[in-house]
Design a protein with these regions (language model features):
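Catalytic cores of alpha/beta
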Residues: 66-69, 243-253, 287, 292-311, ...
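Bateman/CBS regulatory modules and CBS-like beta-alpha motifs in cytosolic regions of diverse proteins
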Residues: 27-50, 57-59, 88-128, 133-136, ...
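Glycine-rich phosphate-binding active-site loops on the catalytic face of alpha/beta enzymes
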Residues: 73-88, 255-267, 307-325, 361-395
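Active-site-adjacent beta->alpha loops and helix N-cap segments on the catalytic face
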Residues: 84-94, 155-160, 205-225, 243-246, ...
Length: 500
């Protein structure tokens, strides 16, 4: 007869944290959000840690190289999507690893034969007022000039005016050679009172820009997540089919950590993938696995050698696995169960395997709840898809700016490898949807606000570290009426004519 779990399966929204004693030391500035990313033995330090407990999901509409850089600057890690060619994913990893903080690859480029109307259209598209003029209009073409808002007046110039007639030519520009350090570049900017400094190589080709506005920004990133060579950390998703070809390419490109991207991780296919990596690379290549929702699934992957285990099936905002297949578990219940298994595994073996809560995060406080329930960090998709740095397009929907967001199990992603059980026959139904999410601006502003809430709540619980939160947190289940009571009610909000 089938096994029935006792008790109901709960979501994060059904729990609240009960405040605890806060000492005078419990202030947000004293809170550390550092947390382990990969397995380690008792008494040792993990090979990789996060400075903030947030990683981005392995999704086409979420984790590209721009977002990977932006998140690493805040202290987290992006897992670049694997639903692309091996060459493209490896190139994406290489771009993140070669990125120099403060050196920006130009995404606003034009040829001298273009017109003022082209400049205006490009500015509208990118939001940037500095446009590089290269011979072929590419980001790495031979630099021939620059156009800023000071080079033209729309009211006094014809739209068809060629760029070459009003650009600032190369001979009148101050540039710096490739190899210039960030400190040297900033000194040039301040000495010559520049807003931007183009970096060019020996052939006169554009390499990057250094902007005055980025100087202070760089100083404001104390949580940057860097490797031993001062490069940003980056992760990448792999599957259980072409790993023998994909993993070596990603390792050669410099990837720091891998994750097997699958909607269901309690399988022979994940075991074979991890075993192949261990036989080929030993412990030098870090790889997470999942997803699972119970203790048995966790122990299976931990015994296989997974460096961390992802928890969650069907809880993502665009995931419909529960609806189409009837499998899954409430995210809060799954996290609690798996984290208990992790602690038991640690007591038995002396090996700590971090747990990643993947899915089910609707509100910022759900992150704190997941951490309090035992998760070491959370994986977010919808949250990051809203930002400028995500790969998807920004669109206007009925007067509201939105970003496109689709699941890896959707027809659009065509990533059947994530949802296959390993046979040769492809699945014929979808486990994800294609959708929009409200545009929310820059990643940095939003992440800092979210983490400010996490730190504040931790102080309310009397905790200065994530481990301390897990030890001191007191949680209570709430009724549906309590959830309503917790929001605004019995007033008319100024942003609406409807009573709430």
């Amino acid at each position: 007869m089938a096994y029935f779990f006792s008790g109901q399966s709960h979501t994060f929204n059904e729990y609240l944290l009960v405040p605890g004693y806060s000492s005078s030391e419990c202030i947000p500035d004293n809170v550390s959000l550092r947390t382990p990313l990969t397995r380690f033995r008792a008494g040792e330090e993990p090979a990789l840690s996060l400075n903030v407990p947030m990683v981005s999901a392995v999704m086409q509409s979420v984790s590209g190289d721009r977002l990977a850089v932006a998140l690493a600057q805040e202290g987290g890690v992006s897992f670049l999507y694997g639903s692309q060619s091996i060459e493209d994913e490896a190139a994406m990893v290489a771009r993140v690893k070669s990125y120099k903080a403060g050196f920006v690859r130009s995404d606003s480029n034009i040829s001298p034969d273009a017109t003022l109307s082209d400049i205006l259209a490009l500015r509208e598209q990118t939001g940037h007022s500095t446009v590089a003029v290269t011979e072929d209009g590419t980001a790495d073409g031979r630099l021939v000039g620059i156009v800023t808002s000071r080079d033209y007046r729309v009211s006094r110039m014809a739209p068809e005016t060629p760029v070459r007639e009003f650009m600032t030519p190369r001979e009148k520009m101050i540039t710096a050679p490739d190899g210039t350090s960030l400190k040297e570049a900033n000194n040039i900017i301040w000495e010559h009172k520049l807003n931007s400094l183009p970096i060019v190589n020996d052939e006169g080709r554009l390499c990057a820009f250094v902007f005055r506005k980025d100087y202070d920004l760089h100083k404001q990133k104390p949580n940057e997540l860097l490797d031993s060579q001062k490069r940003y950390l980056v992760g990448a998703g792999i599957n259980t089919r072409d790993y023998a070809e994909r993993v070596p390419a990603l390792v050669d490109a410099g990837v720091d950590v891998l994750v097997i991207d699958s909607s269901e991780g309690y399988s022979e296919w994940q075991k074979r993938t991890i075993e192949w990596i261990r036989e080929r690379y030993g412990d030098s290549v870090k790889v997470g696995a999942g997803n699972v929702v119970d203790a048995d699934g966790f122990r299976f992957l931990a015994d296989c050698g997974a460096d961390f285990v992802k928890v969650g099936i069907g809880g993502g905002s665009i995931c419909i696995t529960r609806e189409t297949k009837g499998i899954g578990r409430g995210q809060a219940t799954a996290v609690i169960d798996v984290c208990r298994a992790r602690d038991e595994y640690f007591r038995e073996t002396g090996i700590y395997v971090p747990v990643c809560s993947d899915g089910g995060i609707v509100h910022d406080h759900h992150i704190t709840l997941a951490l309090a329930m035992g998760a070491d960090f959370v994986m977010l998709g919808r949250y990051f898809a809203r930002f400028d740095e995500s790969p998807s397009d920004k669109v206007n929907v009925n007067g509201t700016l939105m970003k496109e967001y689709w699941g890896e199990g959707s027809n659009r992603a065509r990533n059947w490898q994530r949802y296959d059980l390993g046979g040769s026959k492809k699945l014929s139904f979808e486990e994800g949807v294609d959708s929009y999410v409200p545009y929310a601006g820059k990643l940095s502003d939003n992440v800092q606000q979210t983490l400010a809430k996490v730190r504040s709540t931790m102080c309310n619980c009397g905790a200065l570290t994530i481990r301390e939160l897990q030890e001191k947190a007191r949680l209570t289940l709430v009724s549906s009426v309590s959830i309503v009571e917790g929001g605004a009610h019995d007033v008319v909000l100024k942003t609406s004519n409807k009573p709430v």
